[in-house]
């Protein structure tokens, strides 16, 4: 069995930045209220005619490719983790065409805020079983298009962005995707969802119904309790399986959901604040993009060193949560 490792990463965010003061002009809130409860100071929002998640995914992917001077034709598989596709049938194929990866298979993966973790795990399986050599994974979301901007419980939280990574086959002894642990509790799906709702009247004599997707709905208190209880347990279970302790970990990278969640999880694990990778204050909750966006920024800032052990954990809608432990090789 061959190994797998991340060899490059890139990210992209929209140009438009909306700070808390501007949000307070839309709904009844304030910068102090938002920062105190979430840690978010500003977020990026995608605007413009015909702009979609594909544009952000393309930009992030090209940055990851350009950093290592890789030809897109070398990519065998593209996995786009998104919950806000440009096309309900999937947007990965559009990314494939846009970057010129004509030889790659492409598909979407929908797991909301856990999407990038599942993309890493899925790509690693394809590589370790010998199916593919070079896989491009992308976490990208434009949840601003699915927000009720009159609902202050949700509109203050989310931003748009994309992050991409290239995972490549390597010798088994050089494997850097060390282990993973995944979970789902579908009984709690209503706590964070974008549900489809049918009209309550039929359109014709055949009793056929049509409807539409609703805005983001979230029970914040329940999501907090879920994350703070489940995520530390997932991380410990994953580390134990690898015979690693929390002291062996150089960096903790959690889905950038909320400052209180990040701090509570770190406290439960007894992780020092200086080991937490976070850019939540600048971008808000970017769903599947949040982990690669923070990882790329940490790398660009020389925060991460080669051979560092990074614990990555995503959690959110589904409810789904999971952990992957990697060794940094870039």
UniProtKB/Swiss-Prot annotation:
Cellular-component GO terms for this entry: chloroplast
Top-level taxon of the source organism: Eukaryota
EC number: 2.3.1.180
Catalysed conversion reaction: malonyl-[ACP] + acetyl-CoA + H(+) = 3-oxobutanoyl-[ACP] + CO2 + CoA
Disulphide bridges, residue numbers: none
SUPFAM superfamilies given in the database record: Thiolase-like (SSF53901)
Keywords recorded for this protein, A-Z: Acyltransferase, Chloroplast, Fatty acid biosynthesis, Fatty acid metabolism, Lipid biosynthesis, Lipid metabolism, Multifunctional enzyme, Plastid, Transferase
Main localization of the protein described in the UniProt heading: plastid
Similarity comment text for this entry: Belongs to the thiolase-like superfamily. FabH family.
Purpose: Catalyzes the condensation reaction of fatty acid synthesis by the addition to an acyl acceptor of two carbons from malonyl-ACP. Catalyzes the first condensation reaction which initiates fatty acid synthesis and may therefore play a role in governing the total rate of fatty acid production. Possesses both acetoacetyl-ACP synthase and acetyl transacylase activities. Its substrate specificity determines the biosynthesis of branched-chain and/or straight-chain of fatty acids.
PANTHER family according to UniProt: 3-OXOACYL-[ACYL-CARRIER-PROTEIN] SYNTHASE, BETA-KETOACYL-[ACYL-CARRIER-PROTEIN] SYNTHASE III, CHLOROPLASTIC
NCBIfam families the record matches: fabH (TIGR00747), PRK09352.1 (NF006829)
Name the record gives this protein: Beta-ketoacyl-[acyl-carrier-protein] synthase III
Organism: Gracilaria tenuistipitata var. liui
